[in-house]
């Protein structure tokens, strides 16, 4: 079994890479891929960079070069669920773009033309992630809708619009739907797992800077535990 793991920033992948053995590193198009062993599985970890375009490039290169059986997107997100605290985790039940609008042509809000409205994660990965929750002690995890866009959300007015469009949204971030869309086109099973670094409000920039390392570490621990259950 070969598993690709994608995080946008160094704090989101650092613990994973430090936990790997027998590593080999290759850089393609400025993106570093670290292949090795983790929890008895063959894994490839990459730091994609921030945003949907860089995430799409990294995912395409990962799939074309390494042919993983599964892809896991790990990292931080802004939270929209009152019962979750910073550091808690959202496991994707579905993934959508929140900044796409081609409704003039009959598509749903958030649906890219000629693509599904929602990208559905692999249930084997989701169930393994849910089993992994027990390994994380007091960290809480839920399964929910994760939305993606090329903006850092900290404006209450934008938050209202997003929640009006996606009332069940549990978290938002900047890469997941792009990764999911590439996986969909290549028919590679995926899951998005995000730890909350902020609550998508006026305090988000301060919270994000303060809690990114914590969120990245929690998400990485979740991924490592998930691997044990595959």
UniProtKB/Swiss-Prot annotation:
Keywords: Amino-acid biosynthesis, Hydrolase, Methionine biosynthesis. The keyword Metal-binding does not apply. Pfam families: PNP_UDP_1. Its EC number is 3.2.2.9. Substrate binds at residues 78, 153, 174-175. It is an enzyme of class 3 (hydrolase). The keyword Repeat does not apply. GO terms for molecular function: adenosylhomocysteine nucleosidase activity; methylthioadenosine nucleosidase activity. Catalyzes the irreversible cleavage of the glycosidic bond in both 5'-methylthioadenosine (MTA) and S-adenosylhomocysteine (SAH/AdoHcy) to adenine and the corresponding thioribose, 5'-methylthioribose and S-ribosylhomocysteine, respectively. Also cleaves 5'-deoxyadenosine, a toxic by-product of radical S-adenosylmethionine (SAM) enzymes, into 5-deoxyribose and adenine. This is 5'-methylthioadenosine/S-adenosylhomocysteine nucleosidase. It comes from Shewanella loihica (strain ATCC BAA-1088 / PV-4). The gene is mtnN.
